[in-house]
Amino acid sequence: MMRAKLAGYLERTQVVFNRYPASDNSLPALYARAIARNCSGKCADAMGDVDQLLREKPDNPYFWELKGNLLFWVGKHQEAIPALRKSLKLAGDESLIQAELAQALLATEDHAVLEEAIALLRRANALDDDNSMTHHQLAKAFYMKGQYPQADLEAAQAHFVEGNVKQAQIFAKRALVKLPRGSPEWIRAEDIVNYKEQT
């Protein structure tokens, strides 16, 4: 299955369809084709493959994750949430799925789900602090809450993880002005501001 997943994400669509033709109804073939279709913008076709995968293996968290991602990328954010919740329930503490669920929650722009999204993103960061997507999503959540210094700090952290130190330092300086001096957040911002790139 892992080989099919990697092929779906990394190979050109035609290569995937040659390796996993429509006549191949095995789970790896369905998985690879669904991912390839999703990545090439043919989400409606991919959804049929994903639904077939879920009929075969309803307890596979990664099939539910793919369904949630398909729904998210076609703009059906609200519909993506139950699939991603199911995926997370089945997968346990999977940082990427936590981040994807939080992203879907935030995309609804419903302020009632902000705390849940923030909690998911913080848990995801505790497991993998080097994922810039979680920091970008935390920045968005804090911005929606009106917590601008925290939003700036998370934006700084996202840019820092991506290797864009200058942009990270711009956001970190903005955060420093408003964060309580000496607080853990202030120290994080100061560390970014004082970082010197190796030459």
Predicted regions, residues:
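Residue at a conserved register position within TPR or TPR-like alpha-solenoid repeats
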Residues: 37, 71, 105-108, 142, ...
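Terminal, low-structured helical/coil segments at or just beyond the last alpha-helical repeat
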Residues: 144, 155, 161-199
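Helix-start (N-cap) detector for alpha-helical repeat units in TPR-like alpha-solenoids
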Residues: 27, 61-62, 78, 95-96, ...
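Structural motif corresponding to the intra-repeat A-B loop/turn of tetratricopeptide repeats
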Residues: 40, 74, 108-111, 145-146, ...
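Extracytoplasmic and endomembrane cell-envelope/extracellular-matrix remodeling and assembly machinery
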Residues: 1-83, 181, 191-194, 198-199
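Canonical tetratricopeptide repeat
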Residues: 32, 66, 100, 137-138, ...
